[in-house]
């Protein structure tokens, strides 16, 4: 496209959740942990900008006292050499920021799980453009509309299923690398 090929994607997503080991964030019986709670957003956004599924997956995870992943560092690379760097945490606030770097521009998306604006910076002259689409307050309505479209047979909505499958494979690979199983998987 007009930005050139995407080379690198960097994403941060950090929330500060109090250590309440019974709540959904840290309780393994409730599928707690950073990967399933917030990582799914980061991995999905990255996969949408990649030409193919990453084949190199490296990561480190720090567990919460319950054993679920509290903080994750994830590095991905696909066959085209596109790389992704993710930093996720449930116990340290950081901006929800995505940076998609291409040959001719980079795109910055703040609050990306519910963003309604992105900033494009052209690398040759530093010129910036803002793109605004939708409303943050309507984020869940958009998810429901996409689900309804996919169920009703809309081909473009069903294409998202391939992305979702890739994201699930990545999350399973990461959990396997960490040797982390939820109680019902043991």
Residues of each region from the PLM?
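Predominantly a Rossmann-like dinucleotide-binding segment in NAD(P)-dependent oxidoreductases
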Residues: 1-57
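Alpha-helical structural elements of signaling/regulatory helical domains
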Residues: 3, 139, 155-156
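Soluble or luminal CAZymes and related metallo-dependent hydrolases
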Residues: 38, 139, 163
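C-terminal helix-rich "cap/oligomerization" subdomain common to oxidoreductases
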Residues: 79, 146-186
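Active-site loop of classical SDR/Rossmann-like NAD(P)-dependent oxidoreductases
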Residues: 131-145, 159
């Amino acid at each position: 496209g007009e930005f050139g090929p995407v080379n690198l994607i960097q994403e941060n997503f950090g929330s500060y959740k109090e250590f309440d080991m019974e709540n959904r964030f840290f309780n393994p019986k409730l599928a707690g942990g950073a990967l399933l709670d917030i990582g799914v957003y980061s991995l999905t956004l990255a996969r949408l900008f990649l030409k193919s599924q990453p084949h190199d997956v490296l990561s480190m995870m720090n567990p919460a006292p319950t054993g679920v992943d509290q903080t994750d560092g994830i590095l991905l690379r696909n066959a085209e050499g596109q790389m992704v760097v993710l930093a996720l945490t449930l116990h340290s606030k950081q901006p929800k920021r995505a940076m998609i770097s291409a040959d001719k521009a980079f795109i910055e998306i703040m609050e990306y799980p519910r963003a309604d604006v992105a900033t494009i910076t052209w690398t040759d002259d530093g010129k910036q453009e803002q793109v605004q689409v939708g409303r943050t307050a309507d984020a869940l309505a958009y998810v429901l509309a996409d689900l309804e479209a996919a169920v009703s047979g809309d081909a473009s909505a069903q294409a998202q299923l391939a992305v979702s499958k890739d994201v699930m494979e990545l999350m399973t690979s990461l959990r396997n690398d960490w040797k982390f199983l939820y109680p019902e998987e043991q």
